Amino acid sequence: MRTGLIAKKLGMTRLFKEDGTHVPVTVLHLDNVEVVDARTNERDGYTAIQLGLGNAKVKNVTKANRGHFARTKVEPKRHLAEFRVSEDALLEAGTKLSAAHFVVGQKVDVTGQSKGKGFAGVMKRHNFAGLEASHGVSISHRSHGSTGQRQDPGKVFKGKKMAGHMGDERVTTLNLEIAAVDEERNLIMVRGAIPGAKNGLVLIRDAIKKARHADAPYPAATVAAAG
């Protein structure tokens, strides 16, 4: 199992194929993605890689993280993310990763923070049908109906679908296809939409329900190797 990548969502566009058909894609930017630290079985009890995205000013970094970056001798990063990997896929701190880490046609899983929708009713939030339009129903047309039972059990069960805050939660979309890769500009174009707003952070991994692409570099595609 190899590492994923942390990227910034730039927005959506479309790519034209040779036959004239077009494909909607989401453009992701790898802003100086670098290995910050590695977790080992001897020290941490598991194996993983910590990646950093975008450079940060030292004054904006917490004192604890300053020490962390100083220990690994890596320039301070604006965002951090950790990926579980196999022991043979560990990378040294300071290794810069390239967009060539993923190849065209490969299936990936993309995780992001969905857009917040505010307080929403059950018809929008849970796709409820609502109550009757007439036949004695007034004012309550978009309500959820019964909340529970009666004196027994005398409570509302946890997880009951009701009105409440919608969106702004961690969402993973599975089996998206890599439509194009631009190594020079460090761009990855994923077919279709992915969770989150523009400039939001996303995590890209090899699809967990699909076999890894035969041409995908292992353990990773570094900037030096890609160049």
Swiss-Prot record:
One of its GO terms (cellular component) is cytosolic large ribosomal subunit. Pfam families: Ribosomal_L3. Part of the 50S ribosomal subunit. Forms a cluster with proteins L14 and L19. GO terms for biological process: translation. Methylated by PrmB. Keywords: Methylation, Ribonucleoprotein, Ribosomal protein, RNA-binding, rRNA-binding. Belongs to the universal ribosomal protein uL3 family. InterPro entries: Ribosomal_uL3, Ribosomal_uL3_bac/org-type, Ribosomal_uL3_CS, Transl_B-barrel_sf. The keyword Oxidoreductase does not apply. GO terms for molecular function: rRNA binding; structural constituent of ribosome. This is Large ribosomal subunit protein uL3. NCBIfam families: L3_bact (TIGR03625). The modification N5-methylglutamine is found at residue 151. It comes from the Bacteria. One of the primary rRNA binding proteins, it binds directly near the 3'-end of the 23S rRNA, where it nucleates assembly of the 50S subunit.
